[in-house]
Amino acid sequence: MYFMTTILVIHAKPLTERKAYMEELLKDFTGKVDYILDADRDELTDEMLAEFFKPGCEVDKKSNAASCAIKHLLACRYIVEHDLEGALILEDDIELHDRFFEKFERSMQEYRQRYSHLPILISYEDSSLQFVPRSQRVKGQWLYESPLNRVRFTGAYYLNRAAAEAIWKDVQENKCDISVDHYQVKLYREGKIQILWCEPPLATQGSFTGRFSSSIGRIRKFEAIRWKLKYAYKRLLYWLR
């Protein structure tokens, strides 16, 4: 019924409650689901950091942020090595909005008609509170070009093979020197990939809503409440623009 892309889940093995959550979340999905398990924080080595990061950069240390970045880069390699058309990449705290796969399929129909010949990353999440202004939205359209100076995080995105190849090639030649979401936008600015936003967004990281504690930095309960209030404000603000 739906576009049967592979789903790759970015997962840290010690977070067993998140694995159980993702299995329940995706239990009705009939396509292939695989987990990116390598490069947990306690598995990082100096050699591994040197393979992916520029020496001395902000992520060149044995941290949760470095682990997360490497897992996303390994997802790119997975797409390339398995010769996939692309994959939907989800972090293990993601909350999918109502009728996610139905709406995802509609966005993919538009992707196939307009963008499949390009190296494409499609962001599906709203965790960064970045939206398409209402004045720019077109009825029946799901995908919009991302501004060059905005970051939508990496909780839920589709990456086609051409974009995965471009990212993996750049890592091999130039190394990553910033957090993975900013690295993706850096490659977008350089013209190596193109980033699209799905509007309306279809997913939110549970680390922001309070469902989970963040695996990178602690988000306290009051911060989750503040995020939800800010979310309502931002949705209204972008609707008025």
PLM regions: where:
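An acidic/histidine-cluster motif and surrounding catalytic segment
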Residues: 2-90, 94-241
